[in-house]
Every structure is written in C-alpha cells, then in structure tokens.
Amino acid sequence: MNTRLTIAVLGGGPAGLIAAETLARAGARVTVYDRMPAVGRKFMLAGRGGLNLTHSEPFEQFIERYGPASDWLAPALRAFPPEALRAWALGLGQDTFVGSSGRVFPVAFRATPLLRAWLVRLGELGVTSRVRHEWLGWTSTGELRFTTPEGEFTTRPDATILAFGGASWPRVGSTGTWVNIVSSVGIEVTPLTPANSGFVVDWSEHFRSRFAGVPLKNVRVSCDGQSVRGEAMITNDGIEGGAIYALGASVRAAMARDGSADLRLDLHPDLTQEVLASRLAKRRKGDSLSTALKRVGLSPVAIALAHEVGAAADASHLKSLPLELLRPTSINRAISTAGGIARSEVDDHFGLRKLPGVFVAGEMLDWEAPTGGYLLQACFSTGVAAAKGAQRFVADESSSPTEPSA
C-alpha cells in the first residue's frame, strides 16, 4: 500500500484497533480517533470477567451462534478465525487457555497486559491516536468533522473505518450517537436494542429484598420454542445471566408480538418429570412444602421462586415454571446491542455502498451473538475484513488512471 495514503479509524475499541493494525502493517498511515481520553476503554471493560476472547468449539458450531447473521459474517470469521485471534494474542506475549466451558481466555486473565502490548505494537507501526475527538459527521465537501477541546477539526483521509460500537457502554464511549449521523445521509440502521441483557420482572418486595443478586444455577430456560441450559441471576428488577442472554432474541420477538414474554424455567433439568413426581410423592409426613422441595434438590432461591409465581408444588410446574418478562432492562446495562447498519447497506468487504471509501466494523453492523467469546471474535474478524476492504479501495483508487488536464 502506498504510504502516502491515509486511513482514519473512528473508534478505539477492539474492531477499530485491529483494523488500524491491519492497515498499518500494509503500509498505510493510520490515525485512530476516539471521543474518550484514551483508546481501548471498552476492551478494558471486557476484561473485567477475565477477557473471554473467543471460543474453542468446532467452527461449524461456532458460526451458528450468530443466528441469522451467520452466513453474512462467515467469510470474515473464516478469514480471521478463533485460532488466528489466539495466535495474535500469543504474538503480543499473551498465551491463552481453554476453560472448562470451552471459552478462551488469556493466561493472565486480564485485559491490561494484552492492551498495553498492543498499544506498543501500534505505536511501533506508526499508528497515531487523537483522543477527545467526538465525531460530528461529514462536511458538505466530504471531510470528517470532529469536535475537540481545542475546537472543531476536519480531515479528509483516503478511506475511513467506522468502528464506534453499539450503545451499551456509554461510559466507555459507545453512545450510539452515530446512528443519527449515518441515517442523515441515507444509510438504513436497524434500531439499536439491548442484547445480552436482563429483563424486567415484577417481583414482590419480599422476594426482591431476599434474593436479588442470588444465582439460579443449573436451570433450563425456554421461550418461543428455544431452550437453553445454564445459569441465571435474580436482580433487583428482574432476571439476567448467561442462559437469559442466550434467549434474548426469542424473548424480544415474543415481546414485540405479544407485549411481554412467557419464560419457562425447568428448575431441575437433571430429572425427568416422572422421576421428580415420584420423589415428591415420597414426601415425609410432617415435612413442610419447602422442606420437601429441598429434599428433591432445589436451592432456596428456586424454592422461593416457585412460591413467588404461585405455582403448584408438583412436578409439571417445577419443570415448566412460568415467569412473565415485561421488557428489557436499560440499554445502558446491556452487555451488547442488537441492531445496527443494515446488511443491505454494505458490500462484501463491509464498505458502505452509498459512501465509497467508508467501511464499517464491529457492533455498528446489524448482528448479535451470545456471550462466550463470540462478541469479541466477530469484532476482531470484521475489523480485519473492513481493513482489507479499505486496502482494496485505496489500491484501486491509486491505480486508477486520471484524465489528462486540458
């Protein structure tokens, strides 16, 4: 790539930084713009739980985690798969390991060492950063506009990567304000909604005060024909956790159709209904209902939940406990967002069809995935793909013959 060509990367999260690295390695002069005081804030936030980079499951199973977007994201994920992400981390001195659930983490179990080494590498590649630069859109002549502490700033790069993320972590820069900007130039954006988020339940004060923050372990949750086994967490205003996040799309679809969602919980997935009924029938004389439920292996929070919803203490109810979910919790509390720039608006290299030279990566695109390493992996993979798309664009532009002047 011609080193005189300049690329602007807007957004200093994982998608933006890997795009910057990819482009700098190809010889471009890259500047990363971010509204925060430093880049990498969202990457650091992802590291709070150990930095789940990706997942080790077979690729064909892995790709299905992206639901309707699986075929769309597949080329990017195949070009930069989980193995490539792990090799990239190792190249920065951070080896990875596979946890018992198949999730992949750095051995350090923190984001800080990896981000520190990454920023050093980016500096060595000549990538520069301009922080406290909030994007305002484009000027009438096509320049990028930013507001900064020193005033307004404009620039005209040879290509642009947009990688602002969704709207789920405003305190680290993902505010979703880009939606109005790109919509104003005719780009279709599917509304951003909470994904990997909790849902509101109308708990009684007694249940809320006693069990908010208590995990509901080893349950199976179902909604609209979808079923997931895992763990949930009772919250002050509802329920969240890995099993709930995995059903998010089904729950939101039910809410859009019916106004609320009927979640069903199997409180004892290890026992069939028949076996559970048999054990309940052997209830000892003098046992209270709670004691009987405890004897069949239910936890205190599961027993309280059965009481909370007023379900009869029989096997059929304990295997399919009804819980009405009223709405998603605030988007500010979501781990990620669904929605984004519509698939129809970008080409095979994630370039905007209506704005040649502008490419999109990460959560700005209209896809979603459960927790487990799938979110970060797709951000990295689409960041690499968008960068390579920008490489092709500037190469084509620089090689195009120009008309001789008159």
Where are these regions (language model features)?
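An anion/pyrophosphate-binding glycine-rich loop and adjacent beta-alpha core
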Residues: T22, T31, M36-L45, F59, ...
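A glycine-rich dinucleotide-binding beta-alpha-beta segment and adjacent secondary-structure elements
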Residues: V131, S299-E368
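A conserved FAD-binding loop/helix module that cradles the flavin
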Residues: S168-I181, V185, D366-A395
